[in-house]
UniProtKB/Swiss-Prot annotation:
This is Glucose starvation modulator protein 1. Keywords: DNA-binding, Metal-binding, Nucleus, Transcription, Transcription regulation, Zinc. Its main location: nucleus. Residues 20-48 bind DNA.
């Protein structure tokens, strides 16, 4: 038999508006306390909270009920107004009767009716206006829409916005004062300096001889270009960052700088053609090397010296670098006299500062994008010295082997590497390049730890410019050099190869390894990997005694998120010929 409940138990078991989450799920009787008794007994009082109810759906019955309520409210408001107006009118009538008792009845009735009208108007003005109630969709889209909705401003079309002859949409008071207005712009009838220069005869186009001007005035600055309506490029060049522009400029210098042989008067790199996507495929190593050069062209080359061809005449990166060095030498501010940045450290000194990933992120603020401009400039000087200046022809080779090999390298850069590199780096900004450098250093730490933990073949890691970043102990033992000789200053991997190995390396790297092979060939089938990130080859490795050791090698590339090569890892295994 069911136990009879006491009065207190009946009171406790009364239903409450909202139960807690636990009691709602377990179907228990909850109380008003928080935490409730059920949660307190079970030790879960910290999680005791009210159960949130789902919002009810608004069906057609609910909408119909709201309409009825609105109609009844409307009738109540009208009744209230009538009830409030009746005593006001009666009081006014009594007062007028006492004041006009001596007048005739007709005048009294006329005055009463006039005052009634005035009082009713005052009463209606004192009451708040009633908002229109929308009872049907027809009212919503009918007359009520015109009353409730304010008129929206008209938005001009694109044709009206970009029409120069139309009236201005924005007020002149809102426009900045430093912008060029229509009155400040030159008329179409006025000729720009460029058009006047084109219309002059050839005899008048020669510059007038005058006093010697400083080097800064020889190159026009971007402000002058903008004022002459000839160019609108910013000071950073054609790309979003100055680092990408400098790297592209050095690649362009390697392609467009003339190289003269010592023993003859012929050039093997065409200096009159600067690299551009339009004339990308015009240079051929065979036809260019066999093209005869007349005496006048040779005299012009000799008198002008080995000048670089600037693809952007309005900016000189070399002059900017010299100017920045001069300003930094004269600058005595505490910011410029601070500690050395990570960018200027050699790989050997950088590893003494950053040994773990924690150190890398600790010194993250000091890391700057790598200066590939100076790297390519020094690499260009080394390649000239290796292939031209120090070229000693043997009995089986002609004197033109060195310049022809250098021309093959330039042709490989121009055909396979530079177009894709420019396309991928066109949209990069300074923050992207800084992130690339941080990712490069983080990947380099992983490669170094792998080389230390696992006994591997001799390994060396370098950047896409050829700068060596890491050399394993096995590589040091194989070549005979020590780590300070390789890592304490800028060293290129090309310094440890002979001429033929350098040419083969650039052919493999530019055509198959840098951005992945785009064509099927022997490197994809037999000596390469399926992902296009590793290539097997052979090279001659320089030893400390001056001899070359034949090695089987594999080049592995590490790319970033933009598919740009960051690091190249080379593993070398010596090949000993059996006699």
């Amino acid at each position: 038999m069911t136990k009879k409940l006491t009065a207190q138990e009946k009171l406790n078991r009364k239903p409450i508006p909202t139960a807690c989450v636990f009691c709602h799920e377990k179907h228990l009787q909850c109380d008003l306390g928080r935490p409730c008794q059920n949660c307190s007994k079970r030790g879960i009082g910290d999680t005791c909270r009210d159960k949130e109810r789902k919002p009810r759906k608004r069906g057609p019955r609910k909408v119909k009920k709201e309409r009825e309520v609105s109609a009844s409210t409307k009738s109540e408001i009208s009744n209230t107004i009538n009830q409030q107006l009746i005593p006001v009118i009666n009081t006014a009538t009594a007062v007028s009767n006492r004041q006009n008792s001596s007048k005739i009845i007709k005048a009294k009735q006329t005055g009463v009716s006039t005052k009634k009208t005035r009082i009713s108007k005052l009463a209606m003005d004192s009451l708040p206006l009633q908002m229109p109630v929308i009872n049907s969709p027809s009212d919503m889209f009918g007359k009520q829409k015109k009353v409730m909705s304010p008129e929206l401003p008209k938005i001009p079309s694109l044709t009206q916005l970009f029409n120069p002859t139309a009236e201005p949409i924005i007020s002149d008071a809102l426009l900045p004062s430093n912008q060029n207005s229509a009155a400040n712009l030159p008329s179409l009838a006025d000729k720009t300096p460029l058009e006047e220069f084109k219309n002059k005869p050839l005899s008048e186009r020669a510059p007038q001889q005058g006093p010697q001007q400083p080097a800064q005035q020889l190159l026009p600055i971007p402000e002058k270009l903008n004022s002459d309506h000839t160019s609108s490029n910013s000071s950073t060049g054609e790309f979003g960052s100055v680092w990408t522009t400098e790297e592209y400029t050095k690649l362009n210098d390697m392609l467009s700088t003339p190289n003269l042989s010592r023993n003859n008067s012929k050039t093997y790199l065409n200096s009159n053609i600067a690299w551009s996507p339009s004339n990308m495929m015009k240079m051929d190593p065979i036809t260019e090397s066999q093209r005869p050069i007349n005496t006048q062209e040779l005299l012009n080359l000799t008198s002008n010296g080995l000048k670089r061809t600037h693809s952007r005449p309005h900016i000189s990166l070399d002059q900017m670098a010299s100017e920045s060095k001069r300003h930094s030498a004269n600058d005595t501010s505490p910011e410029s006299q601070g500690g050395e940045t990570v960018e200027n450290l050699s790989p050997y000194r950088f590893r003494l500062l950053v040994k773990t990933p924690e150190d890398l992120y600790k010194h993250q603020a000091l890391i700057q994008p790598h200066n590939y401009k100076s790297a390519y400039l020094e690499l260009l000087r080394f390649l000239r010295w290796r292939f031209i200046n120090s070229d000693k022809p043997s009995s089986g080779k002609s004197q033109r082997d060195g310049p022809e090999q250098l021309q093959n390298i330039a042709h490989s850069i121009k055909t396979h590497y530079a177009p894709i590199f420019v396309t991928l780096t066109n949209s990069l900004i300074a923050q992207d390049l800084k992130l690339q450098e941080i990712i490069l250093q983080r990947a380099l730490l992983e490669y170094e730890s792998m080389a230390k933990l696992v006994n591997c073949t001799p390994m060396c890691i370098w950047r896409r410019s050829g700068e060596i970043c890491f050399a394993s102990n096995e590589f040091i033992s194989l070549t005979g050099f020590n780590k300070k000789e390789i890592l304490n200053k800028r060293k290129f991997i090309m310094e440890f190869m002979d001429n033929e190995s350098i040419v083969d390396y650039y052919d493999i790297f530019h055509e198959y390894l840098a951005f992945g092979s785009t064509q099927s060939g022997p490197f994809n089938s037999s000596t390469g990997t399926s992902d296009g990130q590793a290539i097997f080859s052979e090279c001659n490795l320089l030893l400390k005694n001056g001899c070359y050791l034949r090695c089987a090698c594999i080049w592995t590339v590490k790319r970033d998120a933009f598919n740009i090569p960051m690091l190249i890892m080379g593993q070398f295994l010596p090949i000993f010929d059996i006699e």
